[in-house]
Amino acid sequence: MPRVKRGTKRRAKRKKILERASGYYLTKSKLYRSAKESVERALKFAYTGRKQKKRQYRSIWIVRIGAAAKLNGLSYSRFISGLKKAGVELDRKMLSEIAIHDPQAFAVLAEQAKAAQPAAA
């Protein structure tokens, strides 16, 4: 069995890491070990960032819907509860888009939510 020295494989592996680290500061873009640590860390942050992005968008939508609901005399929770009872099946993303781009349509939705709420005791 011939001996394998991995010359090309190792070079390709190092080159891939150093290419990913291009633009990093000082030795993090030049030295393999530092670059590898930085790239791994960056990939970990990127992974968690992709998860956080979904949470952040949802919270932005909720803030927008809450602000628009306040303008129509409802709290966010009463607005969402009223829509569920009225059978309106719009997700928060669409509701926030409607609140921004079509306030009249949002007012109609708010009226539907108010009508579906039981009378306050």
UniProtKB/Swiss-Prot annotation:
GO terms for cellular component: ribonucleoprotein complex; ribosome. PANTHER family: 39S RIBOSOMAL PROTEIN L20. One of its GO terms (biological process) is translation. This is Large ribosomal subunit protein bL20. Keywords: Ribonucleoprotein, Ribosomal protein, RNA-binding, rRNA-binding. The gene is rplT. It comes from the Bacteria. The keyword Manganese does not apply. InterPro entries: Ribosomal_bL20, Ribosomal_protein_bL20_C. GO terms for molecular function: rRNA binding; structural constituent of ribosome. Pfam families: Ribosomal_L20. CDD domains: Ribosomal_L20 (cd07026). The keyword Ribosomal protein applies. Binds directly to 23S ribosomal RNA and is necessary for the in vitro assembly process of the 50S ribosomal subunit. It is not involved in the protein synthesizing functions of that subunit. Belongs to the bacterial ribosomal protein bL20 family.
